[in-house]
Swiss-Prot record:
A Pfam match: 7tm_4
Record carries keyword Mitochondrion: no
Extracellular side: 1-23, 78-98, 157-193, 257-267
Primary location: membrane
Gene3D superfamilies xref list: Rhodopsin 7-helix transmembrane proteins
Function: Odorant receptor.
Subcellular location field: Cell membrane
Glycan-bearing residues: 6
Protein name: Olfactory receptor 4S1
UniProt topology in membrane: Multi-pass membrane protein
Listed transmembrane segments: 24-47, 56-77, 99-118, 138-156, 194-217, 234-256, 268-287
Name of encoding gene: OR4S1
Family: Belongs to the G-protein coupled receptor 1 family.
Source lineage: Eukaryota, Metazoa, Chordata, Craniata, Vertebrata
Disulphide-bridged cysteine pairs: 95-187
Organism: Homo sapiens
Amino acid sequence: MGAKNNVTEFVLFGLFESREMQHTCFVVFFLFHVLTVLGNLLVIITINARKTLKSPMYFFLSQLSFADICYPSTTIPKMIADTFVEHKIISFNGCMTQLFSAHFFGGTEIFLLTAMAYDRYVAICRPLHYTAIMDCRKCGLLAGASWLAGFLHSILQTLLTVQLPFCGPNEIDNFFCDVHPLLKLACADTYMVGLIVVANSGMISLASFFILIISYVIILLNLRSQSSEDRRKAVSTCGSHVITVLLVLMPPMFMYIRPSTTLAADKLIILFNIVMPPLLNPLIYTLRNNDVKNAMRKLFRVKRSLGEK
């Protein structure tokens, strides 16, 4: 297979051909990416700096924030840089690295959200045993398993793609290297590979979605026997998580579970999935969480007092 591969680089089409639109993309996505990195860094620093945010929920939130920094960083900086050049070139090795990284951090994000749903289930449905069940060891295992599962998902996607023969053309109708556009360029029958790719990505998204739905149905049924104050806190916490789950899971479910056709909106859906959840997650989890907001205020007060000295 490898001997037939005479493609050393790929040409990315990007989002728009118009130079004016590309300049607009540069401004918008540069701003979005800076806000994403700063917002998630602020969440990580706040959680690690305040002793009041040491519960498992905030441990998983810091893990999610780290994944949310890394996920768009695999594609957006390259896309921003490409707005300055006419020919958007990426090497074969660079393409495979981008493919692996995007699926690694994107997959890990989904598994972390599943771990967070389990944490909320234990906290609400088994409150008396919560600290015993969700100890440091269990949290570390769940987080480690999420990152390992993301790695296994990504390495399968990458190995399936890298072993394909690419004889030309080498033009990818996308703004980054993803599996489906690359399968169309391979000079071999990719039917079985395509099925495995769909099963790998689509079923992970679908299975995670159903696990999360079942978890929250059980949580809602459990809330009926609790006080109105406990219900309010649980709905506030779980509501943030549900919004994030929908933002993260709906685009890949649409992309991989529907029949394999090319839609003009596909690139925009992928872009939404890469850019918007990492950008919005810090807002979603902080605006609805008084503990995080208070911790951030105290952190800024400490910074201000140190600056005055």
